Amino acid sequence: MMKKLIQLSFTVMIIFTILVLGVVANEGLGKPKKQCNEILKQSNCVAAECDSMCVKKRGKGAGYCSPSKKCYCYYHCP
């Protein structure tokens, strides 16, 4: 009788652990955040300067110079 109780308790504990890990992993993934962008400079883009302006303005943004030499700042929408 005691052996079956320990086995049942162990099984319940394993199932509970798997469920908790699944919920935690799902929360970590979350929904992908929407990406926004804005033009910071219309011409003569310099990559380092563009990235610096973007980080200064948006915090976790990333600056990118387009082939037409515009400076775009990409960031997660608020």
Swiss-Prot record:
Keyword Signal: yes
Record InterPro entries: DEFL
Disulphide bridges, residue numbers: C36-C77, C45-C65, C50-C71, C54-C73
GO cellular component: extracellular region
Key words of the record: Antimicrobial, Disulfide bond, Fungicide, Plant defense, Secreted, Signal
Main location: secreted
A biological process from GO: killing of cells of another organism
One Pfam family per UniProt: SLR1-BP
Signal sequence, start to end: 1-25
Location of this chain's protein in the cell: Secreted
Stated family: Belongs to the DEFL family.
Protein name (record): Defensin-like protein 149
